[in-house]
């Protein structure tokens, strides 16, 4: 009777365990395999979240000093006391770099020779993320242009100690801009906002609140941003104008020798020149071929009256105040006086004549000495809260991607077991 019963099927065939059938390596040729979860999806998601975190939250939240126009019964005039000599400088010129992918068309030597031929004393070869010091005539100072982001928020770093390769790649908010300004300012002697108006790189709101920068290219070869300069000054931010060509082709006369800065320094030594820029002993010039047909002779304050004298006589001398409003214009003179009104918080001067347009730095009200602006401060509770929120969100996204990948893998395995 026992011999007539069919043998029990324990799942053992040809001496193999049924677990062996689940191994893709043991499957018969041509049989469907059971794919593993696609881990690359998880890794790709993790990388995307990391890049997004860097671009979105790799910075603190700041509290900015409230705009407060200059005030006081005294005046700070950057052009006093007198002394030193005037030097011609351009800190924004690009030479060939990075295998020709970016920057200028000419070599560093050619760029230096071009400016030397136009009588420049100082040149800054401000290539992107590259400091050049290759020539003594004209003096080449350590400078570079920082910025590789969709919003075109760029900086001109002069007297650079090192290159900051970090940047936020997307359109930057004001907190990201402040974070970069603080990093760049700590690694340089003079920090400028480059062409602030170009493609919305910086708004007038930004420059009126940001701290840790010395000035801006209110007038450059590619963009004029006087309204931005006046916005900062009207908010009580003492910022100097440093004009430059921003030339990418030194052989182009329409782009080279069209905007530069005159600096009154004790000597051509780099320390003296950078100190003069920081003090505001400069004025910007527009012209052609680097030719200076009219120059500032003096800018003095006495008993509430600002006196400007030029050599030779100017076509016009215009005094501009709070909000960028022209307060007074005088024509065909070599000397003009302006009496500060009670509501004048600052006055800056523009001079036209002999094929040039000059932009003087402002004289501002103060209670004594140079007015200082408080620095933006980190709001730690908001910053930590933001970081935690985005960390939780990022972990959730990565976990969801991992679960999705596992479900897809399980589905493929189940389908592979289904008899065809």
Language-model segments: residues:
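Short glycine/proline-enriched coil/turn segments at helix->beta-strand junctions
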Residues: 135-139, 186-188, 237, 313-315, ...
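Catalytic-core segments of hydrolase enzymes
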Residues: 216-217, 240-242, 257-259, 266
């Amino acid at each position: 009777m026992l011999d007539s019963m069919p043998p029990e099927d324990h799942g053992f065939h040809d001496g193999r365990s049924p677990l062996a059938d689940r191994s893709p390596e043991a499957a018969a040729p041509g049989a469907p395999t059971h794919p593993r979860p696609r881990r690359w999806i998880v890794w790709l998601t993790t990388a995307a979240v990391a890049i997004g975190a860097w671009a979105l939250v790799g910075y603190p939240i700041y509290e900015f000093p409230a705009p407060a126009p200059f005030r006081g019964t005294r005046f700070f005039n950057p052009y006093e006391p007198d002394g030193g000599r005037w030097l011609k400088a351009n800190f924004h010129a690009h030479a060939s770099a990075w295998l020709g992918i970016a920057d200028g068309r000419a070599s560093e030597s050619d760029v230096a020779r071009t400016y030397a031929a136009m009588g420049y004393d100082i040149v800054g070869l401000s290539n992107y993320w590259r400091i050049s010091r290759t020539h003594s005539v004209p003096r080449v100072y350590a400078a570079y242009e920082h910025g590789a982001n969709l919003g075109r928020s760029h900086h001109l770093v002069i007297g650079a100690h090192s290159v900051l390769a970090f940047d936020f790649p997307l359109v930057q908010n004001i907190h990201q801009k402040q974070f970069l300004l603080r990093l760049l300012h700590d690694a340089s002697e003079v920090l400028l906002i480059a062409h602030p108006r170009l493609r919305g790189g910086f708004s007038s709101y930004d420059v009126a609140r940001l701290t840790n920068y010395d000035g801006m290219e209110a007038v450059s070869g590619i963009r004029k941003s006087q309204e931005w300069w006046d916005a900062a000054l009207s908010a009580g931010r003492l910022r100097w104008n440093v004009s430059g060509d921003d030339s990418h082709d030194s052989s182009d006369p329409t782009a080279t020798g069209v905007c530069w800065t005159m600096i009154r320094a004790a000597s051509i030594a780099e320390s003296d020149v950078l100190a003069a820029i920081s003090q505001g002993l400069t004025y910007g010039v527009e012209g052609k071929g680097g030719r200076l047909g009219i120059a500032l002779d003096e800018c003095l304050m006495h008993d509430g009256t600002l006196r400007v004298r030029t050599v030779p006589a100017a076509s016009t001398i215009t005094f501009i105040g709070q909000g960028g409003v022209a307060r007074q214009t005088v024509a065909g003179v070599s000397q003009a006086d302006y009496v500060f009104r009670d509501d004048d918080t600052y006055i800056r001067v523009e001079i036209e004549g002999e094929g040039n347009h000059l932009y003087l730095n402002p004289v501002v009200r103060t209670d004594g000495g140079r007015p200082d602006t408080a620095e933006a401060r980190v709001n730690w509770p908001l910053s930590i809260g933001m970081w935690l929120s985005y960390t939780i969100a990022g972990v959730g996204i990565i976990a969801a991607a991992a679960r999705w990948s596992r479900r897809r893998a399980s589905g493929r395995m189940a389908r592979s077991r289904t008899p065809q």
